């Protein structure tokens, strides 16, 4: 499957809106295509942002892994001061919708609340420092929450190792297959990859 097939993901996005009964009043516009296809869901008349749709790449996450993620989000929402984008239930009462795409693959779709915000400005060092400090505080809350929640051991999540991150069987695919990869960049990154692997062994 060509993950860059935007038309395919657009079709899945439109089909997912029907699972929420939103197909008449909302439209989904692609934000980014990476390990997931992420869409902004807006009201057609008012332009109001009603949610963010995430379409998982087939084979990237299992349904159990995504359900675990939904449970953890609920715990974070209920037991920490952190503001999280909660999943919105479909007409069937489920957080995760399964859509069969035009290619015959099943796609897992989740719409979460829209939370306003902005990406870090890499040209504003002072702002970046503040945002990374806040990111550190947020990460600390998440670590603490996993320590005190007795449901953590029941979560089915991807295991992050050298092999699943940048190895030959990486979850996001082989980084060497990046269309704009140059031979110089590949040589440098290959050396970095070998150093990382050696240090982790």
Q: Can you say where each PLM-predicted feature lies in the sequence?
A:
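Active-site acidic catalytic loop and adjacent metal/ATP-binding pocket
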Residues: 34-52, 87, 190, 194-201
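Short beta-strand
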Residues: 28-32, 86-89, 153
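An alpha-helical support segment within catalytic cores of ATP-dependent transferases
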Residues: 9-19, 148-151, 166-201
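Juxta-kinase regulatory segment immediately upstream of eukaryotic protein kinase catalytic domains
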Residues: 1-27
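ATP-binding glycine-rich phosphate-binding loop
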Residues: 20-42
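A cross-family kinase active-site recognition segment
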Residues: 122-184
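ATP-binding pocket architecture of kinase catalytic cores
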Residues: 43-150
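Short secondary-structure junctions
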Residues: 17-25, 79-83, 201
């Amino acid at each position: 499957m060509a993950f860059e097939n935007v038309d395919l993901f657009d079709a899945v996005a439109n089909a997912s809106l029907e699972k929420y009964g939103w197909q008449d009043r909302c439209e989904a516009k692609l934000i980014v295509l990476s390990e997931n296809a992420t869409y902004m869901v807006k009201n057609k008349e008012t332009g109001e942002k009603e949610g963010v749709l995430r379409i998982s790449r087939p084979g990237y996450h299992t349904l159990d892994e995504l359900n675990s993620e939904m449970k953890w989000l609920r715990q974070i929402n209920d037991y920490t001061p952190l503001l999280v984008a909660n999943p919105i239930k479909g007409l069937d009462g489920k957080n995760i919708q399964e859509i069969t795409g035009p290619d015959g693959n099943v796609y897992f779709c989740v719409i979460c609340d829209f939370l306003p915000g902005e990406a870090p400005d890499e040209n504003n060092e002072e702002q970046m420092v503040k945002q990374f400090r806040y990111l550190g505080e947020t990460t600390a809350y998440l670590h603490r929450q996993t320590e005190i929640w007795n449901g953590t051991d029941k979560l089915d999540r991807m295991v992050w190792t050298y092999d699943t991150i940048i190895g030959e069987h990486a979850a996001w695919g082989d980084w060497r297959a990046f269309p704009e990869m140059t031979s110089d960049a590949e040589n440098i990154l290959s050396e970095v990859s070998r150093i990382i692997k050696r240090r982790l062994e």
